[in-house]
Design a protein with these regions (language model features):
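Hydrophobic transmembrane alpha-helices that form the core helical bundles
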Residues: 108-140, 177
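Helix-loop junctions at the membrane interface of multi-pass solute transporters
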Residues: 24, 54-57, 98-101, 158, ...
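Membrane-interface loop-to-helix entry segments
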Residues: 131, 147-189, 204, 242-249
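Membrane-water interface regions at transmembrane-helix termini and the short interhelical loops
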Residues: 54-59, 85-86, 129-139, 152-174, ...
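Membrane-interface "cap" regions at the ends of multi-pass membrane proteins
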Residues: 1-63, 208-214, 233-243
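Extracellular loop-to-transmembrane helix junctions
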Residues: 54-85, 100, 107-109, 249-250
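Hydrophobic, small-residue-rich membrane helices and short re-entrant helix-turn-helix hairpins
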Residues: 25, 29-33, 162-172, 223-255, ...
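Hydrophobic alpha-helical segments and their helix-loop junctions in multi-pass secondary transporters
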Residues: 176-203, 210-213, 217-221, 260-267
Length: 280
């Protein structure tokens, strides 16, 4: 009878195909910083982060208040995620497997449930946003939204089937495209408001305590930061895992918070879909 023990060739091949979900990533499967950083940056380029920035931007002065909040908030988030990335790269284990060392078998199930539950909302938000974009910008009837949401949800989930390799190739396309799109939007917004001087003169919206602003910036992606270890574990060393994760969450997440806050401050609207429609 064919052997399927953990050390057999068949078992090792299956583990490699599934990206080692129940074991540490072996040395030969580790990835470089150049491969890992774009994946983690792509992970942070989440549409909900734009809305988070949109909630903060109109309520505070652009300089130095808003820039300071973005810097501090994303530094907190980045260091938190980077420390987890260091541990993940050092152990090679997934988020849930590492949770067993902290919370035990039963406790780790609760961790898995809580983090998994947040992803339901994450997918729901992203898929609904894509449907709204098509409604607003392409004139697709709202009666199609159910089908559109299902399509985009399964399209996003499909990357999990193909694992790291699919995320690697997708990030090479999606990250530059997202940066170009948001850069273009920021350029239009900057021209519309009359530069930084015009932005400084924009009337402030309802006041928002700095503690609440920091909570929004950090809290919007703290769950994602916790689960980023599922990718940072592929780093060849703890140092590389730390650097790749810090780059992604401090710069990548910070860029989206800044973009959402900037555009919301210019147009007085935190809804990025309506902002894009207004920009044409």
């Amino acid at each position: 009878m064919t052997s399927t023990t953990p050390n057999s060739p068949i078992a090792n091949t299956a583990a490699a195909t599934e990206d080692y979900p129940l074991s540490a990533v072996p040395p030969q499967a580790r990835k470089s910083l150049i491969s890992l950083a774009p994946i983690l940056i792509g992970f942070t380029l989440y549409s909900g982060t734009l809305f988070a920035g949109g909630l903060v931007g109109p309520s505070v002065q652009f300089w130095p208040d808003l820039m300071g909040l973005i810097l501090v908030g994303n530094l907190i988030l980045g260091v938190y995620a980077a420390l987890l990335g260091f541990i993940a790269a050092d152990t090679g284990l997934t988020t849930v497997l590492m949770a067993r060392f902290s919370f035990g078998n039963l406790g780790s199930r609760w961790v898995d449930f809580i983090l998994g539950f947040t992803q339901i909302g994450w997918y729901a938000w992203g898929s609904a946003l894509m449907a709204k974009l098509l409604n607003t910008l392409a004139g697709v009837p709202e009666s199609w939204n159910g089908i559109l949401i299902l399509f985009f949800t399964y399209a996003c989930c499909s990357t999990a089937y193909f694992g790291y390799k699919a995320m690697d190739w997708l990030s090479r396309i999606a990250v530059p495209a997202m940066v170009i799109l948001m850069g273009w939007s920021l350029l239009i917004a900057n021209n519309d408001v009359g530069g930084i001087a015009g932005l400084q003169a924009v009337e402030l919206g309802d006041p928002l305590p700095y503690t609440a602003a920091i909570t929004i910036i950090v809290g919007t992606f703290i769950s994602g930061g916790t689960q980023s270890t599922n990718w940072s574990r592929f780093a060849p060393s703890g140092k590389t895992g730390f650097i790749a994760t810090l780059i992604a969450f401090f710069l990548g997440n910070g860029f989206l918070i800044f973009s959402g806050a900037f555009c919301a401050k210019v147009y007085g609207n935190p809804d990025i879909v309506e902002v894009m429609a207004q920009q044409g």
